[in-house]
């Protein structure tokens, strides 16, 4: 079990707080300053002394290590045609868990999430995944846009999910190594992430709704990509 993030009391200072923050940042653990009421909620009645560590029941992997395990070379990527999912700043743990459940069901080879501005992989996320989250490798990246460029160099084609894209999921070429990028619930894909994608793809909606829940969109896109892999 690893530490997903460290929460510090808002306006907290002093050598001890500074040391905690320094250790967390050295280990790549996000640090967040929050009101004391939030700390009390997260501590669930326990004495927190201005610091709460949010633990992750699943240890995140390094991106390069995960990719090497999936397909170590460009030729291996072209032969295996892996399916990757990249999640850009989804903030609701329940959506995160539901997305992971769909990813496992579709046979996704790996998931990549940002190190910051991402929902924690907590008990709520695990519950929403129906316990499937430990069955798929998940890695964290400090820079999604740069990481997508590296994916393309490895031989992956990167599709970004965007509601206004002219290309629909029915028109996408899924019979190749693919990484699908999903945006956040409210803002969608970050501009630099959009720029890093090879192509944007949309889900055509027939009824009078503007968009789908991000976990529903994930399921549709992943199973479209899984079809030629069946």
For each predicted feature, which ranges?
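RNA substrate-binding interface of SAM-dependent RNA methyltransferases
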Residues: 1-30, 76-167
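A residue-level signal for conserved active-site and pocket-lining positions in enzyme catalytic cores
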Residues: 53, 125, 158, 181, ...
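N-terminal positively charged helical leader segments and presequences
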Residues: 1-72
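Short basic, glycine-rich beta-strand/loop surfaces that mediate nucleic-acid
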Residues: 42-56, 129-132, 137, 175-183
């Amino acid at each position: 079990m690893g530490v997903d993030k460290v929460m510090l009391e808002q306006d907290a200072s002093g050598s001890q707080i500074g040391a905690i923050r320094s250790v967390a940042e050295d280990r790549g653990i996000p640090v967040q300053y929050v009101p004391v009421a939030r700390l009390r909620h997260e501590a669930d009645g326990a004495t927190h002394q201005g610091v709460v560590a949010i633990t992750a029941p699943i240890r995140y992997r390094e991106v390069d290590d995960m990719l090497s395990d999936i397909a170590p070379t460009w030729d291996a990527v072209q032969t295996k045609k892996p399916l990757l999912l990249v999640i850009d700043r989804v903030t609701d743990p329940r959506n995160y868990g539901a997305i992971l459940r769909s990813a496992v069901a579709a046979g996704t080879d790996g998931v990549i999430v940002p190190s910051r501005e991402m929902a924690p992989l907590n008990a709520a996320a695990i519950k929403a995944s129906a316990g499937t989250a430990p069955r798929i490798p998940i890695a964290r990246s400090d820079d999604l846009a740069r990481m997508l460029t590296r994916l393309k160099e490895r031989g992956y084609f990167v599709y970004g999910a965007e509601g206004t894209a002219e290309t629909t999921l029915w028109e996408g070429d899924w019979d190749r190594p693919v990484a699908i990028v999903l945006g956040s619930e409210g803002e969608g894909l970050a501009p630099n992430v959009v720029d890093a994608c090879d192509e944007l793809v949309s889900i055509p909606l027939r009824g009078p709704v503007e968009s789908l829940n991000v976990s529903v969109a994930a399921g549709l896109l992943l199973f479209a990509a899984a079809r030629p892999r069946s």
